[in-house]
Amino acid sequence: LLPALAKAKAAGQRASCLNNLHQIGLAVQMYAEDYEGKIPRGNNVLWFLVYMPYMPQGGTDRDFRSVKIYRCPSYPNKKQVICYVDSSWSFRSTRDNIGFEINDPTPLENFQRPTETIYIADNEDGPWRGIVTGLRDEDIRRHDVWHPSHISSSKQTDPTHGRRVSNKRHNGGPNVLHYAGNADWMKADQMTVDMWREKWK
């Protein structure tokens, strides 16, 4: 009975997390409509701050800590208020498999496969990601993915170039949000660099 209850609880948390990402996806689309089709990426503009006015709950006092949608119910440390990472990853060409960090807004129309390309995902808990409790926290800007070692299939764990997308949050994989606004679950070892590109090979 207990294993069955644990499995049911995990399934419920996974569904709740997916719903969070769906809601964030709606906010992304509404924000883009108001800002010439562009969305924030990187550290110049913090995504979880600019999307607050478009959220159906919380954020009315301009405090991102009140937006429950930003919290994955399966995140191990319940004090964490931002449980997702966004993509600030860009590439010089389709042959570039390393890429670089971008900190400028990006037009949604730049993404050739918006239903398949990842924008936001479950973030890994670990030494790279401290608990964020306020805007002055040292780790407030550690919320993005911009290197192959950051994705869920990576085995690296150091603070800077270690895995930033969870590899086991929900039954062996993360939930992810795509640029088109659709969200789904995927196996950690199936995540590839190409899934983060503006232009696919």
Give the positions of each predicted feature.
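Amphipathic alpha-helical segments typified by the pilin-like N-terminal helix
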Residues: 1-19
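Short, well-structured segments within or immediately adjacent to enzyme catalytic domains
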Residues: 15-201
